């Protein structure tokens, strides 16, 4: 039995969906512990491309329980669309469970998110406009709506009376947005509650029953370490905690229940939205990485910013999450390059630093210090064993493992399930150096 957390070691979009899908084959329970529809993951099965925002990747395995935990925020309209899409693709959704205590994104959250971001002007932070920040803000202010409220007409009316009046006043008087019809909102969300009711459970009871039965539990994070509310590039962050510690809070488990933490990182770096990005590229190489990597956001459709692999934020992710091993994705995107650069340190105010600065202003002034490695200039897409990889590709992976000071367990070479080299099963295999310098 092993309980494993999968986190993003960069700014999100690292390929966690594919890695979680891969590991879900060995999991009895998959738990999404934070975030909302601001995250997206793509799973490719044969010719099927499934783009999900809320539903855990493990939904493709009929015997696996997929739990959306208390730390998430739920947009029921989006969730029901995803469920309908899965049913249309003949995917069994009976294993999906939703925490009754998860908070709900209401229509006023989306409207406020968009209005506030627009008002920020050139100080915008790059929000997805999906209402995530305002939903978490209401949660912190103890003014939020939870899934269980959608199951009781009287309770929902009582819970919404004050917030709806307050939000309508804000929308109308501050942002010039038309107010919402209270009765229409209530009826709409009661309808969502009726459809979701068969999936609503006590999250804590589900997880701890699985733990007592010595089941394998996989905790799936959204976004990435550098978007963490407390430990990311604040204020250019999300409104929750994607790091491994967030699994304990969002799922309701103690840290002693976690056996292993796996970090997912691209073989290069990407970022969506605003904020400093020291290794960001411009010109033809940026275009090449973006086009070959299909770097467009699953949630927003925005073109991702691309840059070289950043070992400084990588080491930071190892430390903050307590990573045991890494999964490196999209190695194949680098196949055509004659040389590849890796950031090993920064220069800040004329001094070399090897740590991640805590202020966004200092981070924006950091200049990357690179080491240049030779490329392999041949396709890796069909490699299925380490020994199939070109020597220079192996050297690159060893360099990353040495730089990050953590072994590599999985190498992904494309979107399909079979385009993967599993050096050692991270769930059942022993903790040992899998691919290291």
Curated annotation (Swiss-Prot):
<feature type="binding site" description="in other chain">
    <location>
        <position position="238"/>
    </location>
    <ligand>
        <name>IMP</name>
    </ligand>
</feature>
<feature type="binding site">
    <location>
        <begin position="330"/>
        <end position="332"/>
    </location>
    <ligand>
        <name>GTP</name>
    </ligand>
</feature>
<comment type="subunit">
    <text>Homodimer.</text>
</comment>
<dbReference type="InterPro" id="IPR033128">
    <property type="entry name" value="Adenylosuccin_syn_Lys_AS"/>
</dbReference>
<feature type="binding site">
    <location>
        <begin position="298"/>
        <end position="304"/>
    </location>
    <ligand>
        <name>substrate</name>
    </ligand>
</feature>
<keyword id="KW-0342">GTP-binding</keyword>
<feature type="binding site">
    <location>
        <position position="304"/>
    </location>
    <ligand>
        <name>GTP</name>
    </ligand>
</feature>
<dbReference type="Pfam" id="PF00709">
    <property type="entry name" value="Adenylsucc_synt"/>
</dbReference>
<dbReference type="GO" id="GO:0044208">
    <property type="term" value="P:'de novo' AMP biosynthetic process"/>
</dbReference>
<comment type="similarity">
    <text>Belongs to the adenylosuccinate synthetase family.</text>
</comment>
<dbReference type="InterPro" id="IPR042109">
    <property type="entry name" value="Adenylosuccinate_synth_dom1"/>
</dbReference>
<feature type="binding site">
    <location>
        <position position="40"/>
    </location>
    <ligand>
        <name>Mg(2+)</name>
    </ligand>
</feature>
<feature type="active site" description="Proton donor">
    <location>
        <position position="41"/>
    </location>
</feature>
<dbReference type="GO" id="GO:0004019">
    <property type="term" value="F:adenylosuccinate synthase activity"/>
</dbReference>
<feature type="binding site" description="in other chain">
    <location>
        <position position="223"/>
    </location>
    <ligand>
        <name>IMP</name>
    </ligand>
</feature>
<feature type="binding site">
    <location>
        <begin position="40"/>
        <end position="42"/>
    </location>
    <ligand>
        <name>GTP</name>
    </ligand>
</feature>
<protein>
    <recommendedName>
        <fullName>Adenylosuccinate synthetase</fullName>
        <ecNumber>6.3.4.4</ecNumber>
    </recommendedName>
</protein>
<keyword id="KW-0479">Metal-binding</keyword>
<feature type="binding site" description="in other chain">
    <location>
        <begin position="13"/>
        <end position="16"/>
    </location>
    <ligand>
        <name>IMP</name>
    </ligand>
</feature>
<dbReference type="InterPro" id="IPR042111">
    <property type="entry name" value="Adenylosuccinate_synth_dom3"/>
</dbReference>
<dbReference type="InterPro" id="IPR018220">
    <property type="entry name" value="Adenylosuccin_syn_GTP-bd"/>
</dbReference>
<feature type="binding site">
    <location>
        <position position="142"/>
    </location>
    <ligand>
        <name>IMP</name>
    </ligand>
</feature>
<feature type="binding site">
    <location>
        <begin position="412"/>
        <end position="414"/>
    </location>
    <ligand>
        <name>GTP</name>
    </ligand>
</feature>
<comment type="function">
    <text>Plays an important role in the de novo pathway of purine nucleotide biosynthesis. Catalyzes the first committed step in the biosynthesis of AMP from IMP.</text>
</comment>
<comment type="pathway">
    <text>Purine metabolism; AMP biosynthesis via de novo pathway; AMP from IMP: step 1/2.</text>
</comment>
<dbReference type="GO" id="GO:0000287">
    <property type="term" value="F:magnesium ion binding"/>
</dbReference>
<keyword id="KW-0547">Nucleotide-binding</keyword>
<feature type="active site" description="Proton acceptor">
    <location>
        <position position="13"/>
    </location>
</feature>
<dbReference type="InterPro" id="IPR042110">
    <property type="entry name" value="Adenylosuccinate_synth_dom2"/>
</dbReference>
<keyword id="KW-0658">Purine biosynthesis</keyword>
<dbReference type="GO" id="GO:0046040">
    <property type="term" value="P:IMP metabolic process"/>
</dbReference>
<feature type="binding site" description="in other chain">
    <location>
        <begin position="38"/>
        <end position="41"/>
    </location>
    <ligand>
        <name>IMP</name>
    </ligand>
</feature>
<keyword id="KW-0963">Cytoplasm</keyword>
<dbReference type="GO" id="GO:0005525">
    <property type="term" value="F:GTP binding"/>
</dbReference>
<feature type="binding site" description="in other chain">
    <location>
        <position position="302"/>
    </location>
    <ligand>
        <name>IMP</name>
    </ligand>
</feature>
<dbReference type="GO" id="GO:0005737">
    <property type="term" value="C:cytoplasm"/>
</dbReference>
<dbReference type="InterPro" id="IPR027417">
    <property type="entry name" value="P-loop_NTPase"/>
</dbReference>
<feature type="binding site">
    <location>
        <position position="13"/>
    </location>
    <ligand>
        <name>Mg(2+)</name>
    </ligand>
</feature>
<feature type="binding site" description="in other chain">
    <location>
        <position position="128"/>
    </location>
    <ligand>
        <name>IMP</name>
    </ligand>
</feature>
<feature type="binding site">
    <location>
        <begin position="12"/>
        <end position="18"/>
    </location>
    <ligand>
        <name>GTP</name>
    </ligand>
</feature>
<keyword id="KW-0436">Ligase</keyword>
<dbReference type="InterPro" id="IPR001114">
    <property type="entry name" value="Adenylosuccinate_synthetase"/>
</dbReference>
